[in-house]
Amino acid sequence: MINSTNLLTIKSNKINHTTFLSAATPVTNPQAKPKTTNSSLLNAYLNNMAMINAPVVKVQKPETTTPANYHNNLRSLFRNNEAKILMIVPRTFNAQDKNGNEYIDGNEIHGTFLNAIDRLDEVKADGFNTLHILPINPTGKMKAMGTAGSLYSPKDLLAIDPNLIDPKDPRSDKDQFKAFIDECHKRDIKVMIDLPSCASYDMFLEHPEWMAMESDGLAKTPQGWNDIRMFQPWKDEGKRTLNPKLLELHKQFVDMCIDLGVDGIRSDVARAKPVEFWDVLIPYSHMRDPEFGWLAETYTYEDASPQANMPYDRPQDSLRAGFDMIYGQYHIFHEFPDATSFMNYIKEQLDMSYSLPKGKSLIGSFATHDDISPMFHGGADYCNLTMGLQATLPMLNPYIVDGYQSGDNYSYKYEDSHNPVTQTDNNEMTVHRGRLDIFNLSRKPGGNQPEIGKFMKSAFAMRDKYKDVITKGTFIQLDKSKDKNDQVIAYARHLNGKTLLVVANKNVNRSTACKIKVPTLKADQKLENLLPSYGQPSILQAHDNELSVNLGPARVHVFEIDTPNIENYCNKIYRQNV
C-alpha cells in the first residue's frame, strides 16, 4: 500500500553492501501433499477440541462445496514461476453503472461475490490462474477516505464487508464468499486474499490492546494516511517479545481464510510487522496447508525508511521468514533511464536468489493498485511492451490489475466531488488520480482498447507453450553495439537446447536501431514473432552471430531461434536458484 518510487532513493539503497545470511531450509516441502499426522495423541486432542467447539445449534450448510478433486498448489505455482495473477476489487469487479456517472448510486448494483462469478469464465479465458483479491473486510467509517471507506482501513479483520453480500440470497456472508471461491476452484483459479497492514480508526478505538502508540500517547499513524492506525506487534521490543493478542488475531485471520478455502495471502506492507511475527504466522499456516502461498508487499533494500512511523524495507528478510514471493521494483520500469539499469536490476534479483531458500520469486509488478495506470507511461504500446517483458523474464510471476486488459486509465469524473450519500463520515469522493479507486463504490474497471487484452492473452499463451524455458531456463544478457542511448533490451532464455530471443525498445517515443550479438545465430534464421504485431513496425535482419534491429517505439519481439549451443559462447549467463 505504501511505497517509494524515487529512482535516486532506489540507487542509494542498493544491496551491494549487504552481507547475506546463509540460505535457510524451507519450513515445508513445496511439493508436499496436505499434511497428515500419525500421532494418535495429537489426533485424539484434535478430535476432542472439535467436539468441544461443535456448535450448539445447527449451522446452515453451504449450498456449494469445494470440488472433490481440487487441491491447493498455490505455493508451488509461486515457487515455479507458474502463477498468472489478476488483481481485483470485489465491490467494483462486476459493478453495473447504468447512468454513466462512474459510481454506483440509486438502484445500481455494485460488485458482490455472487455477481463476480459471472466474470470467472472471462478470467480463465484470458489466461489467469490466480486472483489477488484486495481486502474483503468491513471498512472503517470514522475519519474515513471516500464514501465507502478505504479497502486498507479494516474495521474487523475477521468479518466480511456487507457490500460484498447479495441481500437477496439467503446464504450467510461467508457461505456466499465460499460459493465464489468454489467457482474459482472449479476453473482451477487460485484465490489469494489481501491482509491489511493497519487498522481503521474504528478498530483503534475498540481494540487498544492491538495498537501502537507514540511516546506522547497519541496513536501511531503511517505518514500520509490519516484514516488508519498502526498495529503494535511487540509486547516488549527490547526483548523481542511479540504481542500475543495481535498474533492471535492474525492466526484467526489465517484460520478463517483456510476454512473458507482460500489458497494464500498477500501481506500489505509486510515490513509493518517484524520478521519474528512472520516466523510464527507463516509456519502456522503451513501446519494446516503446506501449499498455502504468501506474497509480501516489499520492494527494495532500505538503510532507513523514507516514511515516518514505517520500518525500513528488507525484502530478503521477508523471503527468509517464509514469504514465497515479493513485489520488487518492476513498477519503476518507466523510471529506469536505460536498458542497462533495467538489466542490472534483473541480475541483482537472480543473484539475490542464491542467498535465499530455493524458489523465491517476484511478481511482474509493472503496475499495481498503488501505481498510476500504465496508460500514462505510453498508452497501449507501453502496456504491450511490459506484458511481453513480464511474459519472458526470469524469477517472475505475471501480475495484472483489473482494467489493464482494455486500457483503463482510472480517471473518474467524480474525483474529489461532494456526494450527499455516503457510508462513512466523509462526503468527499476521494480518488488518487490515475489509480484504481479503492475508496468509493465505483464503476467496473475497463477502458476502450481491448487490443491490449488480446495481446496479453497471446503473451500468456506463448508463456504456456514455452513454460519450461521461461520458468526454468537460463537468462543470457546479449551484448549490443551502436545503441547510442542504450534503449534496446536484449536477452535470451535457454533450456535443453531450446532458445527464445527477446528484443525490446524501451523508448516509447521513437524507433531505436542497433546490432545485437547472438552467438551461433545463422544468417538464414527465420524470424517469426511469437507475439502479435502492434504500433509502428520494426525491421529485423539476421546475420551470422548477429541481429540487426530497428525497433518501433515500445515494441517487443520474441523469437524461437535455432542456437542449441548458445551458452557455450556467452559469458553473461544467469540462473535463478530453483
Model-predicted segments: where are they?
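Active-site-adjacent "subsite" loops/lids of carbohydrate-active enzymes
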Residues: 201-260, 270-271
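N-terminal structural segment of carbohydrate-active enzymes
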Residues: 59-190, 198, 554-578
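Aromatic- and acidic-residue-enriched segments that line the glycan-binding/catalytic groove
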Residues: 139-158, 197-226, 307-324, 413-427
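Non-Sec secretion/translocation targeting segments of pathogen effectors
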Residues: 1-65, 578
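Short, well-ordered beta-strand segments enriched in hydrophobic/aromatic residues
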Residues: 499-507
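The substrate-binding groove and active-site-proximal loops of carbohydrate-active enzymes
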Residues: 91-113, 153-174, 229-247, 262-272, ...
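Active-site-proximal helices and loops of the catalytic beta/alpha 8
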Residues: 66-67, 181, 185, 189, ...
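C-terminal beta-sandwich/jelly-roll accessory domains of carbohydrate-active enzymes
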Residues: 507-578
